[in-house]
Structure formats: C-alpha cells, structure tokens
Amino acid sequence: MSEFEVQVVNKRWNPLAEREELDLVLVHVAKPTPSRCEVEEKVAQMLGVDKKLVVVTKLLSEYGIGRTRARAHVYKNYERLQKLEPEKVKKLHEQCSQAQEAQAQ
C-alpha cells in the first residue's frame, strides 16, 4: 500500500441520491498514484463507514506534481449504491472488494 494523504476539498449531501459526494485531493509526492481500492479504504477509514459503501468515481493525476484529484460517493446503504452507480464503476468497486477479501484471508 502506498503512502498518501487525503484532503477533502468539498463535501456535499445529495438528498435525491441519498449519498455524500466528496471532492478530494490525494497528495503522494514521490509515490505512485494510489489505486481506487486504496482510496476507498482510506476514505472509509476517515469517515468511519463501511468500505463497501464508498465508491471512487474519478481519479485524475496531475503530471509531475504528486497530486491526484478524486471524486468519491459515500452511500447510506448498499442497495442505493447498486441502483445508482454505472455498471463500470460497480464492476471496479466489486473487484476492489474481492481483492481486499482475498488479502484478508
């Protein structure tokens, strides 16, 4: 797992989607860009929620700076996540969950 710092730039509640939407800046100077799995885990840890309820929808690295902009959604329940997120994002999220479960064993 790479070392990086997470800074919350903007945090807003979306009542229609029943989720919290976060704009993040990841600082990883002289380190590779963190994976979606690592970011989901770190955000869940920061907010004290289950990792399965956090979805990283966007990662955009800034060349040569060691900084990445990210967007994450934090849901109140898993059913809402399944209903609203696009298939591509859900697939990436499931791969992260499976990889973390395999690591735990």
Swiss-Prot record:
It holds the Pfam family Ribosomal_S24e. It comes from the Archaea. Keywords: Ribonucleoprotein, Ribosomal protein. GO terms for biological process: translation. One of its GO terms (cellular component) is ribonucleoprotein complex. GO terms for molecular function: structural constituent of ribosome. Belongs to the eukaryotic ribosomal protein eS24 family. This is Small ribosomal subunit protein eS24. The gene is rps24e.
